[in-house]
Structures are given as C-alpha cells and as structure tokens.
C-alpha cells in the first residue's frame, strides 16, 4: 500500500457510517416491536441500569461513556417518560442516584430481544473468531481514544 493510501485510512469514516445506519435500523426495529418510546441512545442508558440499578450519575456516565451534561439531559427525558427516577443518596445528598422504574424493567426482555436481532444482522456472515478479533480491535481503538481524551 502506498504512503498516500495509508494517510487516507477510512476507519473513522466507516465507523461513523456503520453507527448511522445501525442507529436508523435499530430505531426502526424498536418501533416495529412497540418500543417507540425508547431511542437507541436512551436504550444505552437503560441497558447500563439493567446491569446495575440504583447507581450514582457519575458511575452511569462512566459506564455509558456519556458526559454528565449529556447524560443529565437524557435522564430528564427518561424520567419524564416514567422510565426512571433520580434521587439524592441517603448518606450523601450531593450524590444523585438513578433508579429504574417498573415500566423500564418491563421493557427489558423486549429490548434485549431486539438487540439480539440487531446483533445478528450486524455480524451476519462473520465467524465467532472474526467477531472476537473485530471486537478486540474496536476495544483497542476505544482504549486509544480514551487515553488521548
């Protein structure tokens, strides 16, 4: 490969394009399964809370890689829609904790099903070995980006 070609790598462009198309498809799949109240970005927050509920916003920010200001805006919308509550920590009122509502817990099974379907579309003809290798490369890219922040 020539030096000129190496300077014009398309990894970032391809990742952005994949994100855009995946987001559009996932939004449609959520709608098709009656989950139109939740968009993929909000699903990312709910998914993190399904893994560990009743956690401080700071921890949720770390898990989702969303800034606190972006997360706060999204949490307000999710709270207004009845998916979660935000309350001060009993031991330290400076800490705001996020807790899932029954409504969001009831969505979990359907949301996970749609996520699995999206994963099947996403990886299509990949072998397990290719998926493992690909995800390893993505983790390295993510680590590189986090280190440079």
Residue ranges of model-derived segments:
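Short, hydrophobic-biased segments on the C-terminal half of alpha helices
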Residues: 57, 75-76
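Short, locally clustered residues in the helix-turn-helix/winged-helix DNA-binding domain
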Residues: 19, 47-51, 112
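N-terminal leader segment of winged-helix/HTH proteins
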Residues: 1-36
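C-terminal regulatory/oligomerization modules of transcriptional regulators
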Residues: 1-6, 128-149
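N-terminal positioning helix adjacent to the helix-turn-helix/winged-helix DNA-binding module
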Residues: 7, 11, 41-42, 103, ...
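Charged, amphipathic alpha-helical coiled-coil/dimerization segments
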Residues: 76-136
């Amino acid at each position: 490969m020539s030096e000129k070609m190496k300077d014009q790598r398309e990894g970032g462009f391809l990742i952005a394009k994949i994100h855009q198309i995946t987001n559009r498809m996932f939004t449609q799949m959520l709608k098709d399964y009656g989950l139109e109240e939740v968009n993929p970005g909000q699903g990312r927050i709910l998914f993190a809370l399904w893994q560990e509920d009743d956690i401080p916003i700071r921890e949720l920010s770390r898990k989702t890689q969303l800034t606190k200001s972006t997360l706060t805006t999204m949490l307000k919308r999710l709270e207004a829609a009845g998916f979660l509550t935000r309350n001060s920590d009993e031991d330290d009122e400076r800490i705001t904790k996020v807790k899932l509502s029954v409504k969001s817990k009831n969505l979990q099974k359907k949301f996970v099903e749609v996520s699995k379907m999206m994963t099947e579309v996403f990886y299509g003809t990949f072998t397990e070995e290719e998926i493992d290798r690909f995800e390893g490369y993505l983790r390295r890219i993510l680590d590189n980006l986090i280190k440079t922040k």
